[in-house]
Design a protein with these regions (language model features):
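Non-catalytic DNA-recognition/assembly elements of restriction-modification systems
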Residues: 1-19, 26-41, 126-137, 145-146, ...
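Sequence-specific dsDNA recognition surfaces
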Residues: 5-57, 74, 78-81, 185-200, ...
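Short, ligand-facing micro-motifs at secondary-structure edges
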Residues: 18-23, 42-78, 92-100, 105-113, ...
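A short glycine-rich beta-alpha junction/loop motif
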Residues: 77-84, 110-131, 198, 268-277, ...
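Interdomain signal-transducing alpha-helices
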Residues: 98, 133-136, 291, 339
Length: 378
């Protein structure tokens, strides 16, 4: 089979995205035009702006710093200039073919700089005839379609597990008499405190900082990649997390506002950011696991956010909102522990299934890469 070698820049002439950058980040699902990034997030939201909309489709958007790519066949605007819009020379390549080919390029992007013009566009690739490209794309699409069906099934199972978790939590707390509900502040050893704000210039080294993307469903994300921030000794003392603390997301969209986590272990002095709130419970009055399970229920989170202040893109809660949240508190600590243990047994089963699903997701990603590598073997 005959191949012709080209630099990527010959196949993918670029355009700067400046003319298509969104003016406002007041996004809404009710608006028409997606705002894109080339990274994993892809669609950041939708805008109602009507000018500067890119419509010369299809194209590939290229993250100039990470080299991530996305194939786009719908009208869009962009968030920033940190990307290149890559047009496709269809005299030489089929759009999907060159997009798939980009996915198997090995490239070191560890240095924080722009890559397309100086280096990435100069990478050479061997390209077959258009007919052969079409055959390869058809085969990849066929295999990916089967893989996508399996991934859809995994996603459905994940959703069902989330529903089951909430059902377990709801059942555990449903029979507690209403007279046992008290404001959370009555069992606090240390009242809620907002975290620390530091500008970007302080980030890069120093102490780990827990941010709002670092905890979900009552737990700090396993293997969470902490950012680091330079701090004074008094800042570390004031904002340090301690084992047994509970953190709450105090500023976010309504779908994430009020999510909590129990701090179970710390490898080194760690602080929490300004969009996070921290409080400490009195273990003589309330079992920490019991409290965390309750706050992880839909109705427990509702208590935390019922007086939230809403703006266009985000909402917030304050220390008073958290302190006044009602929580059922049986006087007997042993009764609380029994409830927590029963929940834990059911949740452990869910977690095992969840881990299996995550492994299957990773295998699907590996299979996708394997399909691409085999497709482009010359």
């Amino acid at each position: 089979m005959q191949y012709t070698e080209y630099e990527l820049g010959e196949l993918l002439p670029f355009e700067q995205p400046t003319a298509y950058i969104v003016k406002s980040t007041d996004y809404s699902d009710a608006y028409a035009t997606p705002v894109l990034t080339a990274g994993k997030s892809f669609i950041l939201g939708k805008t109602n702006e009507t000018d500067g909309i890119f419509d010369q489709l299809p194209v590939i958007i290229f993250d100039d710093f990470t080299t991530a790519t996305q194939f786009v066949n719908f009208r869009f605007k962009v968030k920033s200039s940190a990307m290149k819009i890559l047009h496709i020379n269809t005299d030489l390549v089929i759009p999907k073919y060159i997009f798939y080919r980009l996915q198997i390029i090995q490239f070191d992007h560890s240095t924080h700089k722009r890559y397309w013009i100086q280096s990435y566009s100069k990478i050479k690739v061997s390209i077959p005839s258009l007919d052969e490209q079409s055959r390869i794309v058809s085969r990849i699409d066929e295999l990916f379609s089967e893989l996508d069906k399996a991934v859809d099934t995994l996603n459905t199972t994940k959703e069902q597990l989330a529903v089951y978790r909430q059902a377990v939590l709801k059942d555990a707390f449903s029979n507690i008499p209403r007279e046992m509900y008290k404001p959370l502040k009555l069992v606090m050893e240390e009242m809620p405190q907002n975290g620390l704000y530091k500008s970007k210039s302080f980030y890069g080294e120093g102490n780990p900082i827990l941010r709002i993307d670092g905890f979900y469903d009552g737990e700090v994300v396993p293997n969470y990649e902490y950012k680091r921030v330079r701090l004074k000794a008094e800042e570390i003392k004031k904002y340090a997390l301690h084992i047994g603390d509970i953190v709450v997301n105090r500023v976010n969209s309504m779908s994430y506002l009020g999510k909590c986590a129990l701090i179970r272990n710390l490898e080194e002095p760690t602080i929490f950011e300004s969009n996070v709130m921290r409080f400490r419970l009195d273990k003589q009055q309330i079992d920490l696991e019991y409290a965390m399970y309750y706050l992880s229920t839909s109705f427990g989170r509702h208590e935390l956010i019922k007086n939230a202040k809403q703006a266009v893109n985000q909402a917030s809660i304050n220390q008073t909102d958290v302190g006044n949240a009602l929580i059922p508190i049986p006087k007997d600590l042993e009764a609380q522990r029994n409830i927590a243990q029963k929940i834990s047994a059911h949740i452990a089963v869910c977690n095992n299934i969840d881990q299996g699903i995550d492994t299957a997701f990773a295998q699907a990603d590996a299979m996708r890469q394997s399909i691409l590598k085999q497709a482009f073997e010359e």
